[in-house]
Amino acid sequence: MSFNHQEIEKKWQGHWEENKTFRTPDETEKPKFYALDMFPYPSGAGLHVGHPEGYTATDILSRMKRMQGYNVLHPMGWDAFGLPAEQYALDTGNSPAEFTELNINTFRNQIKALGFSYDWDREVNTTDPTYYKWTQWIFLKLFEKGLAYVDEVPVNWCPALGTVLANEEIIDGKSERGGHPVERRPMRQWMLKITAYGDRLLEDLDELNWPESLKDMQRNWIGRSEGAEVHFNIDGTDEKFTVFTTRPDTLFGASYCVLAPEHALVANITIPEQKEAVEAYINSVKMKSDLERTELAKEKTGVFTGAYAVNPVNGEKLPIWIADYVLATYGTGAVMAVPAHDERDYEFASTFNLPMKEVVKGGDISKEAYTGDGAHVNSAFLDGLNKEKAIVKMIEWLEVTSAGNQKVTYRLRDWLFSRQRYWGEPIPVIHWEDGTMTAVKEEELPLVLPKTENIRPSGTGESPLANIEEWVNVVDPETGKKGRRETNTMPQWAGSCWYYLRYIDPNNSEALVDPEKVKQWLPVDIYIGGAEHAVLHLLYARFWHKVLYDIGVVPTKEPFQQLFNQGMILGENNEKMSKSKGNVVNPDDIVASHGADTLRLYEMFMGPLDASIAWSENGLDGARRFLDRVWRLFIQENGELSEKITDAPNKDLEKAYHQTVKKVTEDYAELRFNTAISQMMVFINDAYKAETLPKEYVEGFVKMIAPVAPHIGEELWNKLGYSETITYASWPTFDESKLVEDEVEIVVQIMGKVRTKLTMSKDASKEEMEQLALEAIKEQIEGKTVRKVIVVPGKLVNVVAN
């Protein structure tokens, strides 16, 4: 008889909900364990089979830790602001708030149907004013610390849509919606000074138990470079510009300079004869994203301005070009070009036939740039020095002559924090008619997003909030001064930067989080989610956490102690699942046909948690068959416990059981769920062969499978005679001494060739081993003289006979 998953799963989900089985008390006697999932964006499409993979992993850990005596915090919530809801509202005329609420209800029901042990009393929703009150409060703190500021920044402007687009909304220079042209134009934006935390974000990575590959992605994104700033005067004018270089030792080899097309000096220094060409080039660049501009493989383009810079170290005049591979937002927006020793400069110089000058020996610059180390040449006071010594000496010279200085720079840019959208947290700032700007008072938070029918873009580049006159226009009650509210909203990243803190104290209206509770629960012990958030979300969350640490809100320097990226579940044909390919698997269908326990077991058994693996219906059926085997082993056709289950011990199963407890316990802790499940399958095979099943082993096995398949776990526990939930039963333990082999396999050789293998007591003496071996091969050595017998205790017997 197989089990009725629909009946059992409904029954236990109802039981858990009614009894609040997974409610986390704020007690401090037990050790704590905080298991966090990357909370989902509740899209209209609902949950897909990729979501439960990470959720099942944290759930297995949470369930095991509860049984091991930990107080477990395992929460769930919704990252619900963001573009898709706004786009849907624009397309249908419905409110994004209603759409979002509908989606959240769908997601919640789907997640509950999978049997995850979340404490639903701690649920958070980033679009709830009682939540985003504190997102706005954090913004005020950033503003007070000078970490939030306004700047003119080039953005992706789509005239047809009348709005600014994020990079991911643009495909081949056109808007994803409608395929309209997109151009770059400077606009007033809020920025967050994440660069002020660059060193700490870099250094503290060393203390984290994160995959090295992921730490490297963050290191590269932060991109710390040591070098020098060099000041260049522009010939015949009072103007000057600064470049940053990691190779100041090659300054004697500079043969031209390049400015970003948007650089403020370009208009001033371009000579009349070059004006037309320069303006045409600037216009052509407007359509390109930063990514397209800096693509290494692309053909180099540029235009000469007609102006010259003066090399401070030797007075040589260097032509000034503009080229799109130099970005105004990176470094100083200007570079000195040393084509003999830099690949990109070499390509550019080759394209435009610009001079090259060797200043480091070791390569052949007629063929390619030489970027290695070597003795300096053609470099006056640096001649003969290697790279390291030459850099130090050149920086000394720059500082003595005030032509430059030592400098550390970052690839990391400040975080562009404003969005010209309706569906986001309002930024709590007022711009006054006298040009000043103040933050909304703390006691006036939350600044609630006003309800409006009209969420069409304003067309001016401001967000749709600019259309709501009665909300935008304010008067200072004390001075009568008129002002306008900030109409930009925060990006979707904002709410997800700190949600792990709100789970700790979700209903606190007086503080973001209670200091005692946050001390108890931080840091998060394990954080599991997709690798697509490896850089931005994690970097932004770490940045906000460090700011909160500096102002005394949190007691730890880092939020997430251990991090793990799950792999992707692909379609059966190894392609990414997508609606357009028609290969999306809906978990609701699987829960109906096979059961939630089967889905959970299958996703954990597919392969290593971090691997991307193709979905397989056969694999799913196999997972269900295994659960049916477990059920049939323990439960008879009439629904009663199997008569094989007895209070008496069974020596034959002893080793297999203790081995299983050891392996499953270790593998769960190390997130090796597939091998833990394999071991449980081995045990079930052994148990089928056994005459009797000791009740202790059956109970231990049920406890081990319950974190993966909690509904069947609860039902079997109940049938074993327990009225309480299995959730807080104590985790099984193993006895090391029971794992030791009593018997060993001995290889028997004749003249070094294996003839047979024998099983004997591991304590057998040399004499016993020899006797048993000779007995086993007596036919093969008949008529031969045994010259010598070599015995290696516990391993082999080699007989020399001829």
Curated annotation (Swiss-Prot):
Superkingdom of the organism of origin: Bacteria
GO process annotations (BP): leucyl-tRNA aminoacylation
UniProt-listed Enzyme Commission number(s): 6.1.1.4
Residue ranges of the motif 'HIGH' region: 40-51
One GO cellular component term: cytosol
GO molecular function list: aminoacyl-tRNA deacylase activity; ATP binding; leucine-tRNA ligase activity
Subcellular location: Cytoplasm
CDD domains named among the record's database cross-references: Anticodon_Ia_Leu_BEm, LeuRS_core
Binding-site residues for ATP, renumbered to this chain: 579
Protein name from the UniProt record: Leucine--tRNA ligase
Organism: Bacillus mycoides (strain KBAB4) (Bacillus weihenstephanensis)
Top-level taxonomy: Bacteria, Bacillati, Bacillota, Bacilli, Bacillales
